[in-house]
């Protein structure tokens, strides 16, 4: 009788496109496909290190609801386009970059002035369009981070030297755009009750899908090593209690779920602004929402399921302090 657990012996990587791959691993003991697949998926979405614009200062702009003469896009659209620029920093945690452009035409990511240790993954990305006589002058701060951090959490209200016109951005640092997993049947000799784990992952190009999986596995190993070296210790009597940390995925706005306009508007009408707000609602509660029918409900359930979430979940630490509606 064999008492040791099986470890995957077959690992296949199928490249599906730039930054997109399917990774297949088998065999696993029954149940381990879901155990490891879900753990890897959650770490991939929440804990990978990446880079994102976090602050912007634009000449002639006081706040994000302004508009600029000679620029086709308003400031809100310009900032959304800027968030689509993919940066990669080498040997530094933050950098402030300059973008200056005048004259009619498109403003591209490649127009940003870069030092030698900053790289652009998508230099052809369009940031704005200038009309005749238009001009754009901006300072962009790019930082290293993990997951998703809303701007209202990052805002430094105690900063007395704050520059007028500095705009704090919601920062999506994660280099992983999408990840899903499936568990299929596998067979080894006479055993047919084994698992095959299939992970479909897409990144923004800062890291490869294979490297993303390697990094997520290291994060899990590092966390589980604490349990492997578990020793009983008595906690200090006066140790302050801490509120449990909130999963960064729950802090993302419902707009990040890429729902149809109808579904998104129905949710906002019910004051559901964040994914953490949404998952605490039951199916019956959502069906009572005006103009939200069964089709929209099924769409919401499918999108949540693709992220390992469901309706009707209970959160003890929601909403977290400082979260704005």
UniProtKB/Swiss-Prot annotation:
Pfam families tied to this protein: RNA_pol_A_bac, RNA_pol_A_CTD, RNA_pol_L
Region annotation Alpha C-terminal domain (alpha-CTD): where it falls in the sequence: 246-325
E.C. number(s) listed in UniProt: 2.7.7.6
Catalytic activity from the UniProt record: RNA(n) + a ribonucleoside 5'-triphosphate = RNA(n+1) + diphosphate
Domain remark in the UniProt entry: The N-terminal domain is essential for RNAP assembly and basal transcription, whereas the C-terminal domain is involved in interaction with transcriptional regulators and with upstream promoter elements.
Function: DNA-dependent RNA polymerase catalyzes the transcription of DNA into RNA using the four ribonucleoside triphosphates as substrates.
Name the record gives this protein: DNA-directed RNA polymerase subunit alpha
Organism of origin: Janthinobacterium sp. (strain Marseille)
Gene it is expressed from: rpoA
